[in-house]
Amino acid sequence: MSKLCQITGKKPMMGNKVSHANNKTKRIFNLNLSKKRFFIKKKWILLKVSSAGIKTINKFGIEKTLKKLNFNVKKKY
C-alpha cells in the first residue's frame, strides 16, 4: 500500500464531508506522509513516515524504534 506509514502502520481513513446544509458525501482523510532519510549503521535508509512516526523517532531514536518493530535494515527501501 502506497499511503502507509512504515513506523506506525497508519493508513488513510474514510469519512464524511459535511456541508453547511448537513449534506454528507464520502471522502478520504489522507496522512501527512513524507519520505525521510535516516542514517543507520554507516548507511542511509529511506522511509515513508507520517508526522506521528517522525515524532516517535525523535522521542525514542531511530535504532530503538526499528528494533521494537523488528524492522530489517538490510533490505533496501
Swiss-Prot record:
One GO molecular-function entry: structural constituent of ribosome
Entry's family note: Belongs to the bacterial ribosomal protein bL28 family.
SUPFAM superfamilies: L28p-like (SSF143800)
Species of the source: Karelsulcia muelleri (strain GWSS) (Sulcia muelleri)
PANTHER family: 50S RIBOSOMAL PROTEIN L28 (PTHR39080), LARGE RIBOSOMAL SUBUNIT PROTEIN BL28A (PTHR39080:SF1)
UniProt keyword annotation of Ribosomal protein present: yes
Official protein name in the record: Large ribosomal subunit protein bL28
GO cellular component: ribonucleoprotein complex; ribosome
Pfam families, per database record: Ribosomal_L28 (PF00830)
Gene encoding the protein: rpmB
InterPro entries: Bacterial_rp_bL28, Ribosomal_bL28, Ribosomal_bL28/bL31-like_sf, Ribosomal_bL28_bact-type, Ribosomal_bL28_sf
Keyword entries, A-Z: Ribonucleoprotein, Ribosomal protein
